[in-house]
Each structure stands twice: as structure tokens, then as C-alpha cells.
């Protein structure tokens, strides 16, 4: 509580100091305290023109606290002292109102309004002075916008008319439509549209300056009659005007900057080259060829040149390739620390970037780890050893004959085949995991989307040895432990298929995944009469297989207020259902709550399911898992100073089970009760943003704790107890 009071006092002090920065304001000048932009026209979005205002007031933390200015004001005038230099560096110098910049802002606003079709727009500036502080109010008077009445295309070249489909107005006129507002943006869109169509149709020397617009309006009329005129081609100032020449590709050849020549198979070169002999020149095909070779790890860079054949409209294309080193070998030692247990690990990685001369990437990694475990009693061995061997082979294309070559060329795709073997020896048990997978990945950058399809993902878990002490204490049927724990120390086969997509355009981000396991094996089980074990599960090679379906949906909305302040809204939903050959989900497929990316008032795996408190009131990592998850977060983010950013957040959520388990009382999802079991937390965060990575420190407090029924403990926000409710998180990267 004392720390909280000191923090409040410190923030209040800085706030008060921020209000008294007059010592840095010269005579006859004023601190720009606030800038407002508004319009006299109802419904007009004046805020969208705020970027045209050149002077902004000093930034505020969370859009409320003028602490950067207050920090600067704490400094003295003697800049030879390090304390004054430091305060000025982390603070923010007062913004003094500048009439020159204000007038320039008015001109910029007026020009922006005219470009948006408001030809008779005016902008007024009003200033309100109080002491040494000034508020600037920009008032927009847009007036009546000009609108397009009629559009006519003046194009003499019949070939270009056909390409632009001017005989089909519904296809030709897109941005410039009758009744739409007459704006510079629409003119630019139409100019770019025509230019792109022609550059993709063989007009190698065409550029947008050949397109001009002529606008005519009657006196005192806001209707515009627009003419889109295409200028004739002229090779030079002395040459006569002609129709624009249309160029075709005569030949495509490849060359290399290395003496060893080209290291890729001819079929791979052809597959990644969108430029084809006999076809018209296309800027889109040129860019696609650059993109295709850029994603090949065997290629370092690509340079494409075109050569005109004299007195013809033919082009020869030369694609110059420079290759990467085909082989790399790396060795990496590392130190480990798991809950205070120290250890070491080493890894050796070999990579071949051009295995079959098709830019196939083979990556083989060997890793070994050792850790000394303390605090275990009753076990002969006190060491943890892990050895892992993994091989991945990635093809820079989809190995899918059922997909059209056009789709494969259009998508930035790859296929991946992987195998791994993991050996773990712990004092309590020995575990072996054999994995194999084959998956597709492809991107659609224009749609800000990426996709993943797991055709098969196979995991075989084998437990060759479990210590008698561990069996007696945790796994025996007569023990107080449960089926969930026992299930995770049995041999298990998981064969799943899945699909996932990601979308991110900067404002909206979405991740969706669905996977299912065991259905194919279940079909074979019935047809081939697989054996069943004592629990009634079908087995393959005396090992039960898992059967379930799982779906996840994650959505984030980022609302940016200005360069220093933004709001992030986030929701994460997950549901997994075991059925058929499984009554319990595999442990790694179950959900948990709490932690740095969830409800931050709880540590990881400390919350839920439902109102479950854990075994004997203690954290229970096995039982505090569930079959469904809900996370909801709202986080206000603000720039503080230098690389430091701050955040204030409210989190809510929990996990639940779909079935009633005796060992998880209160954990089952019930429609009439689940909303009462939603946990709520609040807190503050500090982030160090180094651009290429972010260090995050979040401090969360419990507000509503569903594990307790008494009002004092359930509504923790009314009776905060830092020892009971406070949780600190350290993480790398943003939470969502």
C-alpha cells in the first residue's frame, strides 16, 4: 500500500509540474496547450484532416497526463549538469505556438479540402489565451462539394479501347462514376488503374503522365463534366506522334554472376518465371518473377533486364541470378534455468539450401541438454537428460498435383516434410516421442493472409519406464490423483489433420485454427477389427490413439488515436472435444489460463477451470486445465519516453471442462453459471521497444476471483491485498 501511495504522489507531482512550465516560455510567446479541429458542416469528418495540422500540443501519457512536459520542466537552465540534460532528454520540450506554421496548416487544410472536391472551402483559426497557454481551434467551412456529372474518354487507339473495355462502361468506369464526388484521389485511382492495365498488356513504355484530365463546370454549378484524354506516344522531341507501341517478349534467358553458372534445374527456372516468350510485356509478370526468385533460399538476389531489338517492338529478357552459399553449419551452446535448476544444452545444425537443385532446404538439428534437478526425494537419479534429432525438408512449392499450376504460381507456397525423435530421461520417468508431419503453407500478401494445412501430423509417445515412487505417489488407481494425470503417462498415438489461417492488415488481426485427430484410425479400427484395451479403447500396435476435434479463434482490433496512444481490443476463444476413442484430451491439447498473454492477475496455469481452486487450495498444473477457453482483453498503450512505452489493461476470462470430472469440482461449463465464473484482472505494463524485439513487464491485480465465494475474496478489487492478488509477468513481445 505504501508503494502505491508513493507512486500516486509521484505521478501527481509530475502532473502538477507539467501545469507550471512557464519558465521555459519566452515573453510574448505561448505554450500550445491544445489543438482542436472542427467543421461548421454537420456530419463532416473533420478529425480525418488532423494530420495536415503542422503543430501538435505536447504528448500526454494515456491521453490524459502531461508528464513528458512536466519531466522537462523539472530540469534547470544549466545544461552542463547531467541531471538537467537527463530530464530534458527523457522529457519533452514545450511546444510554442508558431503563427507561421499555423498559417501553413490553414493553407494545407484548404488544399486538402479542395483535393477532396470542396473547391470553395475556407479555413478559420481561432486562438484562446489563458495566461501563458494557448488553445488553437481550426474551423473548416467545406461548402458544397463538386460532383462528377459525366465522364468521357478521349482515346484514339482502338487497341487501348479494347483493353480498357470502354465498350462496357460497367467495367471501364470504376473510380469515376456519375454522381461521385470529384476528388484528386479518384483521379489518381483512375490514372493508376489505366496505367496498370496498359503496362500489363504490353505497353512497355507507357507511364501515367500520358493520361490527362479536363474538367468543365458551368458557372455557379457544382457539376463537373470530365474528359479523360490519352496523349499520343512520341519517342523523342523530334519524333512524330504515333499510337503507343505494344511490346512482346521474343526470348527469355538466364545468366549467373558466378563462374560456376546457374545451380537450379531448368524446370525450376521455368516454374518461377512468369515472363514467357511470345507473350506481351507485363509489369505484373515482371514483379511476380522477382517475388518468386526472392523466396528461393538458394538465390541471393535477382536482376532482370530487357533489351529492345532495333526497329521492332520485341524484347529480349535476361534474368541474372546470384546464389547463396548452399551449405551452412552452426553450433550453439546455451545455459538453462528451469525453476532454479541449472543446466546446459548444445545444438548442432546443418542446412542445405539447394538439396536437389530446386532450392529445397534440408535442415538437420541435433540437440542435447542436461539439468541437475534438486528437491526430489525418493529417487535414485537426480539428473534430467534430453536428446533431440530433427530433420526438415522444405520445398518452395506445393507438392500437390491436384492443384492448378496457375494457383500454385499465384500463391507464395511451400511444402514441408519433417521427422523428429525426442528422448527424455527424468528421475520420475523416461519418455520417447517420435513425430512425423507433412504440411502445406501459402501466402496471399494482397489479402494480408497466410495459410497452413497439416495433411498429416503423427506423434507417438512411448513411456518405457516409470519409477515405482512416482507410480505410488501419483499414478496408482488408489491414489488421490486422477485420470487426467494418469492419461498423460501412458503410451499414446496422435494422428491429426489441421488447417489454420492468419490475417493482419495492421488494424485487424485474426488467427483461426481447426484440427481433428483419430477419425481415419477409427474408420480402420472398425473395418479391420482393431483390438481394444482394458479401458475399451481401440489400439494400434498395443497403443491407444487419441480422437478429438479442436478449434481456436483469436481476434485483435487496434485503434490508433495518434502517434503516441492506441487501444487494443482482443478476444480469444477455444474449444476442444474428446470423443470416440478418447474421454480425455491429451495434456498438450488442453487449455490453461493466466500468464503474460492471458488474464494477467494470475500466474500461468493458476486460473480455473471454472471456480476450481486447485488441489487443497494449491496450484495444480494438471487439474488446472480445461476443454474450452475464453480470454477478453482491453489495453490502452502509450509512448512514455525514449524506448519506454506504458500500458493500462483489463483482462477477463477463464477455462472450463465439457465433462464433469470428480477431481475438478466447479470446473464444468454450465450456460447458467459460466458468466459468474469469469475472472477479471487489471494492471499496468512497461515495455522496452527496441524495434526488432520488445521486453515487456506487466503487473496484474486480481479484481474478481471466481475461486472464492465470500464477497471479500471474490470481489478482490474492493479489498485489494498485494500479497494475495498481485502477479508480475516478464515476457518478450506484445501480448496480442
What spans do the regions from the language model cover?
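Hydrophobic, well-ordered secondary-structure elements that form the walls
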Residues: 293, 350, 393, 512, ...
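Gram-negative/organellar outer-membrane beta-barrel architecture
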Residues: 162-163, 282-509, 600-601, 612, ...
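Periplasmic polypeptide-binding modules associated with outer-membrane biogenesis and secretion
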Residues: 2, 20-337, 367, 549-551, ...
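Bacterial N-terminal signal peptides that target proteins for export
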Residues: 1-8
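C-terminal motif of bacterial Sec signal peptides marking the signal peptidase cleavage site
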Residues: 15-18
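Membrane-embedded beta-strand positions of outer-membrane beta-barrel proteins
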Residues: 331-333, 362-366, 417-419, 510-514, ...
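Strand-connecting loop/turn motifs
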Residues: 118, 203, 326, 357-359, ...
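C-terminal outer-membrane beta-barrel translocator/porin domains of Gram-negative envelope proteins
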Residues: 336-339, 452-638, 648-652, 656-671
